[in-house]
Structure formats: structure tokens, C-alpha cells
Amino acid sequence: MTEIISLKQKRHQKELKYERKMLRELNLTEIKTRIDDCFRSFEGKFKKTIIEDGCIDFAIEAFLLGAKYSRFGYYGESMHSANKRCQFEEKRLMDDLFDYLLNWGKIKEGDLLIEELFLACEYYIHSWWEQGYTKGEKRYKLRLH
């Protein structure tokens, strides 16, 4: 006998399958080099291993978010307008990464590095979102989704 599953479960299974396929596109060494590029100026303020662990998680989340919204690019929407669709989720990722780095770093409340750190977090998350978007759009165009 066949098992009956709801539409919600089916969508969730399909989304997980797509995410697994997209994660094959990620490269850990590329993530680590991007971490070094973005957060090199804060080298004395953070312990590198702790920061790498968190940044890898946030890079994966941002990459998958961009890949999820790449479907709209396949149907003719620009990257900018697709980014506006997920502005709330991307902003949440930026804020969470910023809070993570503030909690694990040695940056004081009145320090001028806070604004610089926030801009670095914005750049880091948005660059991974863009990469996920372009790779996801490529997969859609090649019909590999």
C-alpha cells in the first residue's frame, strides 16, 4: 500500500533534495578564503577557529537562501528584484552574524570597529547570497533542479 503524505511534506522533501544538490556546489576552502578576505582587519579581536565555525554556518545559510530565490531569476526577474523579495531573511542573517561576532569577539560597545564589522558582515552575507543565486540560476537554466 502507498503511504499518503501531505502537500506540505512533499514540498519540504523537494526543498531538502534541492538544498542537498546545491550544497555540492560549495567548497570549504573557498568559504575559508572569503572569511579571511572579509574579516582580516579584525584578526586580533577574534579567535580564528571560533569565527570560522560561525561564518561557515552563515555562509551556507546565505548561499542556500540565494539558491532558493534563483528560481525567480530563471523566470526573468533581475537579481536585484529577487534580492528585494528576501530582504528580510538576508537582513536577519546579517544581524545574526553581527551578533555572533560581537558575542565572541573583544569589541567594546563604544568602539569604532562596530560599524566596520557590521559592513563586513553585510558584504560577507550578500556575497554568499549572490553566489548562491548565480549557481542556482545556472542549475535552473541547465534543468538540473
Regions found by a protein language model. Name each.
Residues 2-145:
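Intrinsic-disorder/low-complexity detector
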